Structure formats: structure tokens, C-alpha cells
């Protein structure tokens, strides 16, 4: 081992450590925000939003488990040829590489499933403009039905997990400069993944993760336009200004949620660049999953802010009326005293 190798390895370990810290910040925040949202959905949802809240709940549960799995995995990509190899720095390594791989599959399936729920949310907002809101049971059935492709994705993708020792040999052959087989340097390194991205199971999983987003976003843009057209009075739908304002607020929230997957696009770009060996820096190896983990952390914040009952309840928790009243009264007294004070 020469000085150049030592410097390279030291640099890689420092970068890995920085991204581990980022993962330990982003994922717990996501767990906190989604837990808050789930509690508010369960306790503060008004009757008129009961059925729609099932979509929020589906989102929140999906994001919550995605953050939990991401925190346990803390994976980075180290592609070697056409093999999809991942190094896991999280606590999952204390159990087994197979468990780490399952967490990887689970995170991917959560992120893919969230796209379907987002599309259904837009379809729902358009549907109820001139139709009776479907009951909660029907919404739950729709959520279960749209989850089936993602469940199949988990089964297919998980079935193609490769032998850990075989993957370690491949990684060491493609990246000998990092000496990944040295326990003195890396400890008990946990590696999992797939032998080839061209195998039927893995390739179909990659297709499911990437291709459906294009037609899904096409549907989202189309129905967003139709919904806003109706709300602006250009459609034939008549409603009160309060109802119209409520619809617009929820559509605004959904529109911002539809922008959040830019993280997905950015992460996928880095992922493909690494896969096709266009770039191979340690930073790029760590970036895709840290970027993707920002999505389930940000999404609940949008619902917490734009859905008025949840925002009001959250404000009441952190700024109780009993605490605000003395402050407001004091401010009013000060203002009154200043206005009646004699002018010198």
C-alpha cells in the first residue's frame, strides 16, 4: 500500500462520513415530520376531508417507512462493470447484507409508489369538482389497487439479490485502489446488490423505477390544467368562493408536491452517470440516495403548511392561545399608551 492509496482511501472515508451525517440528519427529520402529519390526519381531519385524507395518510406512511429504511441502510453506490453494487453504512449491517438489500428495495419501491399516489391526488381533486366525494372505503381500495405494481416490484427486485462474497470479489477487481477487502481499513464492510443490471428481474425493476414517471407526470399536468380552468370560472362548475379557494389551496399544495420529484430526477441522473461509468467520484457515489432521501422529508412539510386544519392544529400546539393572549394584550396596551401619551 503506497502513500497515494492511503490518501485516496482517507479522502473516501471522510466523504463517506460527511454523507452519513447528512443521512442521520435528513432521515430522522423525515420521520418526525411524517409522524406529526400522521397524528394530525388521525385527530384533526374535518369530516369533509375524510376521504381525501386517506391519500395524505398513504403519502405519509410511505414517506415515514422510506425515511426509516433509509436511516437503517445509509447506502452508497459503487458500480463495478454492469454489476449494481451498494455499500451500506447503516445499522442494517449488524443483521445481514440481505436485510440491507431488502431496505434498498423497500426505499426504491416507496419512492416509486409515491408517484402513483400523487397522480391519484390530482385525479381526485378534479373528480370532486362536480361529483360527490367518494367514501373512505373506496379511496382505501384505490390505494391498495395502485400499490399492487409496487408490491410486485419488491418481489421481483428482491428475488435477484446476488451473493455477497461474489459481489465483494467484483468490487475489489474493479476498484483495487480502495482495498475494500481489508478489514483493518474498512472493518466489516457490507455489500449487496445485483450481479448484472441486464438480468430480467433487475432490468424490469429499473424500467419500473424510471419509465412510468413520464406518463404519470403527463396525466398530472393535464388534470392540473383542467382543474384550474374549472376553478377560474372557465368551466361550467359553480361553487362558493370559499369552496373555490379551498380547492385552489389544495391544488397549490399538490403542484408544489409535483415539483419535489426534481430530487428524484437529479438523483437518477447521478445514478445513471455512475452506472455507465461517466463519473466515478466518491461524492457522486454518495449523492443519489442522500438526494432521494430529501423527498420524503420535504413532502409532509407541504401538507402541514397548505392543508389549513393541519396548519391550524400545529400552530395551536406550538403557540397555544393561552400563551398568545397575554402577549397580544400587552402589545395592545403598549400601543394604546403610546397613542394617548401627551406630546412634549
Curated annotation (Swiss-Prot):
TM segment ranges: 21-41, 54-74, 102-122, 142-162, 203-223, 259-279, 287-307
Subcellular compartments: Membrane
Membrane topology category: Multi-pass membrane protein
Gene3D superfamilies listed in its UniProt record: Rhodopsin 7-helix transmembrane proteins
Record keywords: Membrane, Transmembrane, Transmembrane helix
Cellular component GO terms, alphabetical: membrane
Organism domain of life: Eukaryota
Entry annotated with the keyword Transferase: no
UniProt keyword Cell cycle present: no
Pfam families linked: 7TM_GPCR_Srd (PF10317)
InterPro entries with a match to the protein in the record: 7TM_GPCR_serpentine_rcpt_Srd, GPCR_Rhodpsn_7TM, Nematode_rcpt-like_delta
Family: Belongs to the nematode receptor-like protein srd family.
Protein name in UniProt: Serpentine receptor class delta-3
Species lineage: Eukaryota, Metazoa, Ecdysozoa, Nematoda, Chromadorea
